[in-house]
């Protein structure tokens, strides 16, 4: 799956330096986060200052920054103008309120927003939770479930928008 990986711009060197280093590290970690080192070639580095135009070509945008509501909401405000009219935006939060995250999104994007929580380490953990917001379109969830099951090989459970969803509440 072709992927664009975002991070903050580097303070020194190339603007995408933080991501370039992260991609290089993916091929060195154990256990390996990628099934094949060659998969790193499908990852395009980008940063939040100069790379937001990349989002216009994305079908699925998964936000996975630190678990702070204010940071996530600030990021959504920043990227929303670059999300195309058919793209799905999902948060990989492990327990923040999906409806509260959706509150800052433009109305035309809210029906394409939900939570998708991959458990760590994602390559080795089979389960993913899908958490709809009250505004999420059912067809968006069905399409995301199909992608997660068929392309990523995950089992999917639907969770309600409650603190920590299902897995973290029961300690998975």
How would you label these PLM feature ranges?
Residues 6-21, 25-89, 95-100, 107, ...:
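Rossmann-like NAD(P)-binding element
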